[in-house]
Amino acid sequence: MQAETSRGPLTGPDAGGPVPAGEPQWRALLETRWRARLQEVTELALAYHEAAAAADRGTGGGAGGRRAQPLLRLLRRTVTSRRALADTEEALARLSAGRYGWCESCAGAIPAQRLAATPEARYCARCARGRGR
C-alpha cells in the first residue's frame, strides 16, 4: 500500500520526490555549484567595491557618465550572481526537505534530465514555459 500526498503517491526510498534526499550525486552537484557561485559573488563584490572606491577618488568626485557604466555593469553581474547563489541555496534546502525534483507550480515530478541540465529548477518544463523561464 502506498501513502498519498497532495502531490500523489509517495515513491522512492525516501518517499520525498523523484530525487531521494539522500542521493549523494545531486547534493554533490549542488554543493559544487554553490561553492563556485559563492566564490564568484565574493570576487564580483570585491571588484565592485574596489572600482567604486577608485571612482570616488577620481577627478570631480563623481562617477557620472561613461565612468559609471563599468560600475553599473559590475553591479548587475554581482546582483545576477547573488540571485544564482540564492537559487542554489534554495535547491539545497528543497533537497534536504525532500521536495527537490517536484514542480512548485503543478506539483508534478521534474524529470532527472531537466534537473541534470538545470539543477536549480523549481518548475517542470511545461510550467517553466508558462512562466516565461
Which positions does each model-derived feature cover?
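Solvent-exposed, flexible loop/coil residues
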Residues: 5, 104, 119
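Short alpha-helical
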Residues: 36, 110, 122-123
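Short metal-coordination and nucleic-acid-contact micro-motifs, chiefly zinc-binding Cys/His arrays
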Residues: 96-99, 120-123
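Short cysteine-rich clusters marking metal-coordination/redox-active sites
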Residues: 103-106, 124-127
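Short functional micro-motifs and their immediate structural scaffolds
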Residues: 100, 110-112, 129-132
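Short Cys/His-rich "knuckle" micro-motifs
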Residues: 113-118
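Interaction interfaces in information-processing and related assembly proteins
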Residues: 1-97
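A broad detector of the eukaryotic-type serine/threonine protein kinase catalytic domain
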Residues: 93, 108-111
